[in-house]
Amino acid sequence: MNRAGVLARRGYSSKGKDILFGVDARVKMLAGVNRLSQAVSVTLGPKGRNVVIEQPFGAPKITKDGVTVAKAIEFKDSFENLGAQLVRQVANTTNEIAGDGTTTSTVLANTIFSEGYKAVTQGTSPVDMKRGIDRAVEVVLQSLTEQSKTIVSKEEVTQVATISANGDVEIGQLIGHAMEKVGKAGVITVSDGKTLDTELEVVEGMSLDRGYISPYFVTNAKTQKVEIEDAFILLCQKKVSTIQQILPVLEHIAKANRPLVIIADDVDSEALATLIINKINGKLKVCAVKAPGFGDNKTNMLHDVAIFTGGEVYNEELGMNLEQHFDHRILGFAKKVSVGKDQTIILNGAGDPKAVEERKELIQGMLGKTDSSYEKEKLNERLAKLSGGVAVIKVGGASDVEVGEKKDRVTDALNATRAAVSEGIVPGGGAALLYASSALAELAADPTLTEDQKTGVRIVMSAIKLPAITIVKNAGGEGAVVIHQLLAEKKMQQGYDAQQGKYVNMFEAGIIDPAKVVKTALVDAASVAGLMITTEAAITDIPAPAPAAGGGMDGMGGMGGMGGMGGMY
């Protein structure tokens, strides 16, 4: 079948392409970016406003999370939607890398694109202006590094988390306590609670540095994770290519009506396709994960997981053969398994605690016998995974809407706190970017730059003042007055406390941002804005008119069941 036929059968059809060039293309894209930014920017700061989002099913969603607002927006005009999609992608990228800063990146991208568009219409070279923007970003990043301060104490961790949770002290304290319990590099997850209160629980858990083989296994579209409970775990020291290799296992879990996690060297070809089809059709709750590590280290880690979950590693070299003889006792078990793109977390494995302790003692003994720094690193890594608990923040609330909104804030706060631990903190409330604008004043006067490049520098200088202005505006203040006062005093740690409506030392007041979040927001925003400024043509699909309602399709009899296992395969 040709490509058009395939698309049509998937419910998508178009009647050709629509193209806009130059100013016409940029005007339309800018309109979409402006509208998206306006909706997102109202959430910025401690007094940011709520946004209500209609849901396809159930009650409307109420949120102050910038990336959630951005994801919900889609315009009828396809060219406006192009611009919105590009900025929405920036927000997603910023969120994935730094865990926060999505609203800041959206505001910055909108300003850089808007000011850049005006400059281009007045005759500025978009290419030279883009070079100026890139130079300005480098200078701002250097300034942010100089302003940053290493985060050390539990109090500082709590402050960062509180700010990212829109001033919720309870969430900040929970995250600070969680990091104290499992360490700054420890595993912390967020889940739905069963009470009105938000609680912290530290459970026995193990994390692996590998995620799902295919995104089709995802069960939670929002978090892009596979979340399953009471799961059997099959550990395979080989590649699984055909479904026949694991058919007895699938028959067993289908009868038991339990989910299955397969951790193997790889799962591909027919086996992967069959698992995905049956998962999508609701016949199996399953997820395939590639085994972590390489060589002997991979083998050892599989055995570590086996001991933690109470299972065995399937290895044909030891005479095992699932097709001829399957013993369900080789399967491990865990109360909960959470699988992301790059990480798998196994909670409450069914392994014998005594066996786990013996395994840890064995690894410690091996540590004392090796002189290889590489082997020591891998042994320490295995020991940490077996020893480390997992902190679970259980979010409670009076309704699903309240729990959902609170989970957004907890996740944002957790991600921002991790970013703060990795690269330090800077004055919050937009102050760090505001003070970086002083360094750009010097760059804008650099005689080696062309006038068009200087225009690019001035655009960034204007844009990085806007987050501070927006935060003050959302709190009911005069943004221009506040930033003028701060720049005039030139006290690099001074800022405006929008919650209290007064000027304070931001570090002392605990109003701080992770340096990584601010840097990532700026880099991503400047990148996409620069691309839109230099865009000379935009192409979209012209949707085909909806077909008239008619009768059912003749000649399509019922689809026959697939043989074996009651139509599963």
Swiss-Prot record:
Supply the alphabetized keyword list: ATP-binding, Chaperone, Mitochondrion, Nucleotide-binding, Stress response, Transit peptide
Q: Which Pfam families match?
A: Cpn60_TCP1
Has the keyword Mitochondrion been applied to this entry? yes
Listed CDD domains? GroEL (cd03344)
Would you identify the family this protein belongs to, as annotated?
A: Belongs to the chaperonin (HSP60) family.
Q: Where in the cell is it found?
A: Mitochondrion
Q: What is this protein called?
A: Chaperonin CPN60, mitochondrial
Report the protein's function.
Answer: Implicated in mitochondrial protein import and macromolecular assembly. May facilitate the correct folding of imported proteins. May also prevent misfolding and promote the refolding and proper assembly of unfolded polypeptides generated under stress conditions in the mitochondrial matrix.
This protein's source sits in the domain of life called Eukaryota
Choose any GO biological process term that the UniProt entry carries and state it.
protein refolding
Q: Name one GO cellular component term.
A: mitochondrion
Q: Name one GO molecular function term.
A: ATP binding
